């Protein structure tokens, strides 16, 4: 600090104020030290696009603007459609964002209309897979990308489960969760796992219990005391709050640090980005567990 005061003392009269401000700025910078790098991790978004209903050309610009501002590492999309006069929605967003993408549908390539799920990423892709979930009569899928996040591989999965609210729907979702977990076990290659999508079930529903036995709920982990009235179904379209869109994470490898809703305000009077809200979360890599202490012979 003394050398800074000496420098101030050499300033001429009319430059005194400017020198004082510069000296104080340098002193503040010296006291603060180098800026700390954010802890390593990733951000992810999940969002049900509501396919091309209502005014898709206007909605897509709103969605694109928000995603450009956030620049998440990965984006899971549901209700993605392509058909005559509607370019594949995931492809359009990926191209505008400069992201890679993976689209999966039960409709065969070349069909005039295809409907399914997608993953978008700004990170290098190490592996990609897709899978048609059992039972095949329900037309549900999962997309998978293994991406490199600051040199560490992370598996991200996007899915959309059965929407029925009766006992049959619950049974089908349970079957889909079991198949999803088997697919993850076969493709994750011992890298951390994040699973995002529209699960059509509350996080504590019995349908998802097998999933919750292995993975944590990112939004619920961050907002543990403030969940009663939270909904990811857009309250403009649905009366009762229902949080059915989730980002699950592998709790022994990742930590949920932040989470919030997206697209939960109209972009114009009576106009919304979707009939769902999106979910954004920031995950941090968990520190490696300490090695067990050596025991005396």
Model-derived regions, located:
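Active-site-proximal segments of metal-dependent phosphoesterases and phosphodiesterases across multiple
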Residues: 160-180, 203-212
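Metal-dependent phosphoester-hydrolase catalytic domains
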Residues: 32-34, 148, 185-194, 201-297
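Active-site beta-strand/loop signature of hydrolases that rely on acidic residues for catalysis
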Residues: 42-49, 63-86, 120, 145, ...
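Structured beta-strand-rich core segments of catalytic domains in phosphoester-bond hydrolases
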Residues: 56, 74, 78-161, 255-263
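Extracellular/periplasmic catalytic domains that process cell-envelope and extracellular macromolecules
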Residues: 36-39, 69, 94-95, 110-113, ...
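N-terminal, active-site-proximal structural segment of metallo-dependent hydrolase catalytic domains
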Residues: 4-12, 16, 20, 26-96, ...
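Sec-exported extracytoplasmic/periplasmic mature domains
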Residues: 68-72, 94-98, 125, 185-189, ...
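Short, solvent-exposed loop/turn segments at secondary-structure boundaries
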Residues: 55-58, 132, 167-172
């Amino acid at each position: 600090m003394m050398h800074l005061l000496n420098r101030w003392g050499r300033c001429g009269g009319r430059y005194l104020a400017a020198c004082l401000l510069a000296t104080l700025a340098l002193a503040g910078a010296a006291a603060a030290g180098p800026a700390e790098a954010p802890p390593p991790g990733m951000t992810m978004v999940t969002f049900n696009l509501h396919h091309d209903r209502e005014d898709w050309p206007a909605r897509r610009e709103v969605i694109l603007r928000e995603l450009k501002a956030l620049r998440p590492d990965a984006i899971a999309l549901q209700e993605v459609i392509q058909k005559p006069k509607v370019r594949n929605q995931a492809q359009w967003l990926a191209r505008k964002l400069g992201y890679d993408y993976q689209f999966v549908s039960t409709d065969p390539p070349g069909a005039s209309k295809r409907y399914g799920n997608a993953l978008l990423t700004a990170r290098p892709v190490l592996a990609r897979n897709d899978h048609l979930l059992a039972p095949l009569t329900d037309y549900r899928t999962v997309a998978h990308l293994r991406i490199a996040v600051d040199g560490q591989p992370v598996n991200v999965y996007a899915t959309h489960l059965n929407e029925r609210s009766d006992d049959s729907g619950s049974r089908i979702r349970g079957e889909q969760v079991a198949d999803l977990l088997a697919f993850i076990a076969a493709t994750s290659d011992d890298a951390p796992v994040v699973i995002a999508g529209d699960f059509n079930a509350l996080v504590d529903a019995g349908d998802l219990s097998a999933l919750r036995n292995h993975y944590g709920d990112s939004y619920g982990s961050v907002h543990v005391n403030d969940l009663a009235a939270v909904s990811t179904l857009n309250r403009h379209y649905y009366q009762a709050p229902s949080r059915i869109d989730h980002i699950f994470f592998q709790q022994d490898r990742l930590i949920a640090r932040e989470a919030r809703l997206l697209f939960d305000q109209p972009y114009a009077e009576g106009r919304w980005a979707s009939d769902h809200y999106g979910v954004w979360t920031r995950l941090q890599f968990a520190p490696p567990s300490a090695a067990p202490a050596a025991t005396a012979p």
